[in-house]
């Protein structure tokens, strides 16, 4: 029976190896006007058999290259009257199609002698007002850089002038500035600290709520911020969400140290160009604990997060999308149920500790082409953050008459914001006292 199983598994693997191809597709638009560009040439330049593969964008600016082998590939995008665009190290996997939406910049030439040099757009930021101290990063880099773990903050610690913390948190020091001065933005809106087990007033945490599989090309700033980043004094992450596959429904799952990921994307209907993209993650350690697997401690971190984006093209005139991200986390370090004090890996041996945190952001992006030279982009979003920490002191071997009540403080922090320039903030704080006595005579 064992030999039959191994033989069947080997045949299944051979079948998979014979079908390792995928499709690269997307849309090409003008960087300034957001208008679709037709007759754009998209060619694979990797020195393999795939170098013969290419495609031409249709009247809607859409292109598709089928039969691309699995691996890393380079793309060259050209159109007469526009600057060349070079995309390097594009990862193609057999699990899902690769969607690349490309922006091309018009090339202006004066009459006379002209020298044209092809320039890679790999690190040029999306924000046209960013002249220095800004860098574009891709989804691939959040996985490929050393110690990134799919986290944009940990990835940024590999850049010049950026120093990361220890492995327990993803706080970053940018050019000597405090990590508290780092700003997080999503789709053009400031958002609260997007990390599980976040501490009030900080910008980092042990585990990021952001799933890098949801991100498109995004910007990271280390200084000389444009005026729109007015609340940043150290660094800024300007994150963009990608749209889901609008022609094919795809599902994927991944189990790792930091969680079990489930992701789905596809079109709402075959006739529509609208699409959805949603991902959910749950704590791996919490799953192991539910299966009665001994983790060496009862203080198991539990967390989960959800991200989504729904995209609805409005023809050639504009686009409407809805996005959201949120997560909650909690951990309880309880020692009061022990007869004698013991040393836990985390926490103190004289108190029970309860910690909860959650954050969420949901909004909408509306883009409307006013004419061939201008467009309107409006973003509306609502954000919320709640952090609750509670400590309960435990007294052992005590005499009741000599016990003086003292003990726990509960801290609560909330932050609600509406729209980018019209902001409403609500903050509350509570302090309470509680006493737990474990008397042993």
Annotate each language-model stretch with its function:
Residues 121, 179, 191, 242, ...:
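Structural signature of outer-membrane beta-barrel domains
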Residues 67, 165-166, 229, 254-256, ...:
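Short sequence motifs at beta-strands and strand-loop junctions characteristic
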Residues 180-182, 214, 247-251, 272-276, ...:
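Outer-envelope beta-barrel architecture signal
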Residues 23, 256-282, 295-333, 354-382:
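Transmembrane beta-barrel wall of Gram-negative outer-membrane proteins
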